[in-house]
Regions:
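A short alpha-helix capping/helix-coil boundary motif
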Residues: 15-18, 141-142, 190-192
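Long, compositionally biased, charged low-complexity segments
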Residues: 2, 124, 241-243
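Residue-level preference for alpha-helix termini and adjacent loops
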Residues: 25, 56, 136, 158, ...
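TOPRIM metal-binding catalytic domain and adjacent DNA-binding surface shared by DnaG-type primases
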Residues: 1-83, 88-91, 147
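Phosphate-handling DNA/RNA-contact segment within nucleic-acid enzymes
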Residues: 66-189
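Tryptophan-centered motif/residue detector
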Residues: 22-26, 101, 174, 217
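TOPRIM fold recognition
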Residues: 107, 150-154, 159-249
Length: 249
């Protein structure tokens, strides 16, 4: 006896697009100038000249911080000030938000939030990313500045690292947000030369990502060069603060 044919598989639902919700959060955020987020960057050692005209970076006075409770349900830890950054495509389409939660310390300085999970006591990450859908962040970045008139652009991993590289070298910068993001970075169409700032991490992950990006750029006809701090474990921000401390250049 012939078996009845199996029913067709249920088509997978497309991932929910959260862009409208992310845009609403972004549009409620305020300019960086004079905000706790600006004071946080200064506390990290970044001069205002490196970030005061930056694009795609704002301040939110009370951003919710969510975790997952022990039963797997969303758990609100609280509302905190935050530095908010828009993760975009080269054309400016919002793909996600990068959130750095903050708290004030003595002397008017601001630092990354030190919060704990209320049930487990484990530290809660002060930095979080939220994408519009699972595949949205590939190639996207926090495009802090467009390339200059010569088409030159710095690419670094972190936001603070990219701004520090701008302070070090005087060129516009973008933050790829991770080694994976650097390797997959999509440069703006007007880019003619990439200055890739690699973290000098012990795993060499940052250098490998920089090499991958450089090879992609050169294949596409874009000039590329890689800079890396000489000190093991350093990134551009560590190098900026070292030079300020020692008075070297």
């Amino acid at each position: 006896q012939a078996r009845a044919p199996l029913p067709p598989p249920t088509p997978a639902e497309p991932p929910q697009d959260k862009q409208a919700a992310l845009l609403a959060v972004w549009n409620e955020a305020r300019p960086l100038s004079g905000s706790p987020a600006a004071l946080y960057l200064q506390t990290r050692g970044i001069p205002p000249a490196a970030f005061q005209t930056a694009l795609n970076i704002r301040h939110c006075s009370a951003l919710p911080l969510w975790a997952t409770d022990t039963s797997g349900k969303p758990l609100l830890i609280g509302h905190f000030p935050a530095m908010l950054a828009a993760i975009t495509t080269p054309s400016g389409q919002l793909q996600g938000l990068h959130k750095t939660y903050l708290h004030s310390v003595s002397g008017g300085a601001w630092q990354k939030l030190a919060a704990c999970h209320p049930q487990t006591g484990e530290p809660s990450p002060a930095k979080k990313m939220q994408a519009r859908h699972p595949a949205a962040l590939k190639g996207a970045a926090v495009n802090l500045f467009p390339p200059d008139r010569q088409g030159r652009l710095i690419v670094a991993e972190g936001i603070e690292t990219a701004l520090a590289a701008r302070a070090l070298f005087g060129l516009p910068a973008a933050a790829a947000l991770s080694a994976y993001g650097m390797a997959a970075f999509e440069w703006p169409p007007e880019t003619l030369e990439l200055f890739i700032c690699a973290d000098n991490d012990t795993s060499n992950t940052g250098r490998h990502a920089a090499d991958t990006l450089a090879k992609r750029a050169i294949t596409a006809g874009i000039k590329a060069q890689i800079w890396q701090p000489e000190t093991a474990g350093f990134d551009a921000l560590d190098e900026l603060n070292r030079r300020k401390k020692t008075g070297s250049r």
